[in-house]
């Protein structure tokens, strides 16, 4: 997708190109030092000679487009969803020349007609992406988004006709937050020109009950993300290593990417709804940091008495490392 996708066959071209650049750099350096010729003169001469090669010309074009794409991508906001503003469902279609499109009308704005600009929709919001036809125009990487509301595909990457749909039914918390990231990106980078009267807006341009429901799910996902961030600070993930016979988990003062003053001991942290677990490093001395009622009665057991924790089988309660048997 626009933010982070590259065609797989680009990897081979990149490898060849980097090898060529390395060889060219060595050659230019040798010529400059041996014959006291300026760097720019040598480069321009070699460029003229190599322009006769179709591979060289195509590689230059590929590198130029890749650099342009990279600069386009770095403008996308970082994915710290809890810091992004909530999506405002209200779009004033009566002001600023905004329009209410039917899905059929929006289809005419897929970039294939010279008489019409290129539009796309996400969560029913229609954006003018005509200024970036190198991405959204016919035959380009993201043309499948043009002329339609393909909200679901922005996060699933399913570009079949069944996947290029507006529905968000069944999407996970992370996928819903990804959609919010995309809306934030398009709000910042492209003009909002209207809405599409379909799943998220009615024929008067007013938000539907479906949009209200989706935004409520997005907010719930955001709260879940915040709670996860807090949980990671309280119960950092364990270090781990695995092989065909099993593996081991252990704790350190930097395990899970969370730097702290204590290492802790490994425990199963149970998610009560799904009963799934992950390995967590648990503070095992002094006052607890989780705030759970069960740990407040002890002043020197850390969070060991938290109700969502279990011991690993055949592992000492005081051990800093536990074996995992496959």
Swiss-Prot record:
Residues 1-34 form the signal peptide. The keyword Signal applies. SMART domains: Cyt-b5 (SM01117). GO terms for cellular component: endomembrane system; extracellular region; membrane. Pfam families: Cyt-b5. The keyword Signal applies. Gene3D superfamilies: Cytochrome b5-like heme/steroid binding domain. It is found in: Secreted. Residues 98-197 form the Cytochrome b5 heme-binding domain. Its main location: secreted. InterPro entries: Cyt_B5-like_heme/steroid-bd, Cyt_B5-like_heme/steroid_sf, MAPR/NEUFC/NENF-like. Coiled coil: none annotated. Keywords: Secreted, Signal. Heme-binding protein. PANTHER family: MEMBRANE-ASSOCIATED PROGESTERONE RECEPTOR COMPONENT-RELATED, NEUFERRICIN. The cytochrome b5 heme-binding domain was proven to bind heme, although it lacks the conserved iron-binding His residues at position 136 and 169. Belongs to the cytochrome b5 family. MAPR subfamily. This is Neuferricin homolog.
